[in-house]
Amino acid sequence: MRNVLSVILGGGKGTRLFPLTQYRSKPAVPLAGKYRIIDIPISNCLNSGMNRIYLLTQFNSVSLHRHIRQTYRFDRFDGGFVEILAAQQTMEGETWYQGTADAVRKNLNNLRDKNIDYYLILSGDQLYRMDYRELLETHQKTGADVTIAAIPVTREAARGFGIMRVDDSGRVLGFLEKPQTDKEIDELVRTDPAWIDARGIESKGRDCLGNMGIYLFNRDVLIDLLMKSDYQDFGKEVFPMSIRTHNVQAHLFDGYWEDIGTVRSFYEANLELTRPDAPFKLENQEAPVFTHARFLPPTRLDGVHVKSSLISDGCVIGEGAVIENSVVGHRCKIGKNVRISNSILMGADFYQSAEELAE
């Protein structure tokens, strides 16, 4: 898959995820105790055989840069890389990124590789597992200029999505951002559930196709769309316009997918991972989630009751502690007889002595 270049968008200010984003960007926020959110799209790329990856960053990016530098190091011979493109002022432009599309436009000089046929545009703040080779297969079989990943959703959920309308071949004909009424859905973007069922996915009452924010562009198509316009955002501007001018196809996806854009969604997604029947399985040998190896000691437990929880490395948990339905991050020290439930402990970057904690 050396002809595919992946571009991961590092996200904006992350105001809806504040205070978790007070000192770090959204993709750098910890996930499931030991990972960072950015590990998800990067792992998806690597598991799909796509190892040429650029990460576009701007806000609070020091922690994210450090994580990428320490984690993703490839040998010199396979041509793979995960490289950071930080926002910068240049002779051509003195403004910062104004949106997702503008971020890619400002980096086209770095992205214009002659050996690249496709650009895969990804968000850096989503939790899901996808084989992008299937997306590429849909793109090539349909002769698409642009292919977008689409997830079937209910009408209630559609109010939080950009919803697309497709014809029988899967070509996208219309798009509506966050429809608020059944009338809007019926008249503009409803998808026949039978069409979804016919493609091997059970519709289960879902008659809307939501935009997942995952786009595959032909190389020249993306460059042309960005250079001949001043569009700032992929979802709100580039994608709707490309529907009118190019062959845009939908690629159906029916796995677990969560946009971790708010404190509530972050909390709920983490706690879902602690369940025995978690909808997203971290323990997947065929498609593992990669992250930084910290070489911490095993967690020490002493007469502890643990139920439906994730405990990271390097923790010390005192006798009689009870931990239920919770995530415990790296290097946490939990005292005797402490009870923790339905909680997320973010962990620590270093150990503190008893004297330091008392100060």
Label the model's feature ranges.
Residues 1-5, 194-205, 219-359:
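Left-handed beta-helix
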Residues 28, 163-166, 250:
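A structural signal for short hydrophobic beta-strand segments in well-ordered beta-sheet cores
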Residues 72-80, 168-174, 181-186, 275-282:
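Proline-centered turn/helix-capping motifs that create local helix->coil transitions or kinks
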